Amino acid sequence: MVHVETQKIRNKEQSPRVAELRQELRRKIAAHAPNAGAHATAILGLTLYRRTAPSPCYPAMFEPSLNVFVQGPKRIALAGTTYLCDESTFVLSSIDVPIVSQVVAASEDVPLLSLLLKLDMAVVREILSQEEFHAYDGSSPVRGIAIGKTTVDLLKPCCRLLDLPS
């Protein structure tokens, strides 16, 4: 039997500025994505998502990307661990990763809203080559994705991306 561990990224009290930026990002995504579905933008690799109904679990492939959730819960399963993502989380994938995904709750009135920015790995490698890193010590599992809490430093550039002309 496979052990399944569920993790929820704890939504500790976040600053009023994080809440304000999240609300601004919600408004911008809702304006650019007025209907359910995936909405390409003028920015190569930037897609906005609006889901208006829960979904069954479905297999998907996470490409190298940054996915920022701003409204609604989504469940992501990877390698025996299930993560519950919500408006306080982001998912960063550095490699192609097979996952199982599910929109947990969404409606016309309160849709799941998120943005996904595909990463150009050649650019990432170039940036990383300019930094000094310590060798991986093996202290944590390597899964190909990282899930964390959104911050002002992440939400501000996301808001600026959606200010660019379409």
Mark where each language-model region is.
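Amphipathic alpha-helical segments enriched in hydrophobic/aromatic residues interleaved with Lys/Arg
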Residues: 4-19, 126-166
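N-terminal regulatory/effector-sensing and dimerization cores
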Residues: 39-136
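Short flexible/disordered coil segments
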Residues: 21, 105-110, 160-162
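A short, N-terminal "cap"/entry segment at the start of jelly-roll beta-barrel domains
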Residues: 1-42, 47, 55-56
